[in-house]
Amino acid sequence: MLKVNIVRVNKNAILPRYATQHAAGMDIAACLDVPLTIQPSETVLVPTGLAVELPEGYEAQLRPRSGLALKYAISLPNAPATIDADYRGEVKVILVNLGQEPFCVNHGDRIAQMVIARYEHAELQEVEELSRTPRGSGGFGHTGV
């Protein structure tokens, strides 16, 4: 199992945890002194009170929680958000209220999922043209909707 160092930069922070044995993402919670209300169409930055030290070659991806998206239209506008291995600051989550009603976030509310993922740097090679495929340049619904 991959070891990731984590620090509570706020003593009241709640450590992320996997909700089930086979969950890909850990639930990550808000760390707030007072409740935060997100108005419809408003975007806010929510602190978690945590900082992580990821091994080289790994990133942490922050993703929306499906229940918040379905029930309240609360999402992450930059999903998946990336936390790089060399970042040492507090993890914060950008939330947007796409719904019609104000949404209140309280301390300890699970606001996102954090997935630890391996990545590789690519070496780009400029060429005159790309190899041909049956699909070609078809995209944006070319196989139907």
From Swiss-Prot:
The protein's Enzyme Commission number: 3.6.1.23
HAMAP family: dUTPase_bact
Statement: the UniProt record of this protein carries the keyword Transcription: no
Keywords on record: Hydrolase, Magnesium, Metal-binding, Nucleotide metabolism
Example GO molecular function: magnesium ion binding
Matching Pfam families: dUTPase
The protein's name in its UniProt record: Deoxyuridine 5'-triphosphate nucleotidohydrolase
